[in-house]
Amino acid sequence: IRILDNSYISNTQFISLAEEVAEKCGVKYQESVRRGGSTNAAKISVTGKAVPCLVLGVPSRYAHSHYNFCAKEDLEAASAMAANVIRALDEEKIRHICHQDVL
């Protein structure tokens, strides 16, 4: 779970939800703070209706090369995390994450 990178500070409510879901479902995760690099989350979070984003990353070696290596278990955990967080979202949780009464 990316907490912060070069261009985006993650929504703390979304992070809390992801951590709750991971604990409940037994999905292993780590928190990450990056001083360099970024994702599209910064742009997405301020586009249109300012959509909160949750950045899930997979630890890997030789990123952005032809030989990017990662553990199969980490890919499976990231997929499980994403699927379970999506399943956990309902209107009430989305409002809580967005801090607004009407979507």
Where are these regions (language model features)?
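Active-site-adjacent substrate-binding region
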Residues: 1-76, 85-89, 93-103
